[in-house]
Amino acid sequence: FIPSLKKADCPSLYAGSNASKPYSSADCIVYRLGETYLISAEIDWRLGNNQSAAERLTTLRNRACKGHDHSMDITAAEVTQEFLLDGYAREMIGEWNRWMTLKRFRAFESRITKANPQITKFDKNIHYLRPIPTAELLLIDNANEYQNPGY
């Protein structure tokens, strides 16, 4: 069994009457309220305001589980980098901004090797940056001065 994810797939909005078309007229999700709560909690955590971060995360959790008791409320002591990264992983699964979140937290190595221990070629001195596209570098005379290390 291999799970799949079709978070933004909307077959009823495929163009034309033929639902086998490879494209859709569904809206593209660019920013979500859940992400706003996570970013706000992250900022509070980085500023040392764990109580405020916990309140934001509890609000986010309440959105997902209406009518729950307070046993799911988050305390200030629970707000850590790992807790926030887990929250981002749950809330933003399958969305494009995961790379930026892991980069911002400098958590590639811990998160990638935790999820996939077979990854051995991760180099923190190289892989936090992406290569500058060759097409861009060909437009300047001193391209070798601008390419990121390791590429």
PLM features: residue spans?
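Helix-capping and short linker residues that terminate individual alpha-solenoid repeat units
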Residues: 65-66
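Long, intrinsically disordered, low-complexity segments
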Residues: 2-3, 10, 20-30, 61, ...
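C-terminal substrate/ligand-recognition segments
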Residues: 1-60
